[in-house]
Regions:
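Phosphate/pyrophosphate-binding loop motifs in nucleotide- or prenyl diphosphate-using proteins
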Residues: 1-218
Length: 218
């Protein structure tokens, strides 16, 4: 009979058990949480689409586009989870973290960042527009997704820096820089909060022209 594992540990791979507060478990938990929030937001969008029937087709088109973009983001997070678990490279991204052929919402990783930093130019949304409850439920959930993606990135940095330090025999707490493992995953995660911000700005621009300083069409 196999020995019963302690309550404070959890199985993760064929390598055995780790504690539930291990960076690996924290990363996977943050990634799982972000996926769950995307699905919640998609459910809300389904309800919004039902309410939009018979109204201006522009509204329905905008909501459907956002629904599709969220599905692309969800699929990407699932690909990241699979890539981390299997050790396989992330599709479209070079192992050294360079962009490769990767696209999200039709944009490269660098374009996602550029659109986020220049939202007024691309979407007519004034720089540093702060989230507000008057922007609606969907926008609030997009902002929540943005913050959760930051948490995923933070957890990933700790995990992959620690893994690299262990592999190289370096002290993880030392000041000497350690090149992290899985730079492909880290590079993508570094751009995903920008991707969520792009969705936020586009959503406001399309459905709240009173906030946008310039017109933007689907």
């Amino acid at each position: 009979m196999s020995e019963k594992k302690a309550y404070e540990t959890v199985a993760h791979t064929g390598d055995g058990y780790v504690r539930k507060d291990d960076p690996l478990i924290l990363f996977r938990g943050a990634l799982d949480h972000a996926q769950a929030e995307i699905i919640v937001t998609q459910t809300i969008l389904d309800q919004e689409l039902q309410l939009a029937r018979g109204l201006d087709p522009y509204i329905g088109n905008s909501l459907r586009r956002l629904q599709n973009d969220l599905q692309d983001l969800l699929d990407l997070l699932r690909d990241i989870m699979t890539a981390e678990y299997t050790g396989e490279p992330l599709k479209g991204v070079e192992p050294d973290g360079s962009g490769g052929t990767f696209r999200l919402f039709g944009l490269t990783l660098d374009e996602l960042q550029e659109h986020s930093h220049n939202a007024e130019e691309h979407y007519g949304i004034p720089t540093m527009t702060r989230p507000d409850h008057t922007f609606g439920e969907v926008y609030a959930h997009l902002n929540l997704i943005r913050t959760e993606l930051r948490q995923v990135e933070t957890a990933a940095v700790r995990l992959f820096l620690q893994n690299a330090a262990v592999s190289s025999g370096e002290d993880f707490a030392a000041e000497a820089p350690v090149v992290p493992d899985r730079r492909d995953i880290l590079y993508v995660l570094n751009r995903l909060s920008s991707a969520a911000h792009v969705l936020m700005c586009r959503h406001l621009s399309e459905l709240r022209p009173d906030i946008a300083g310039a017109s933007y069409t689907v």
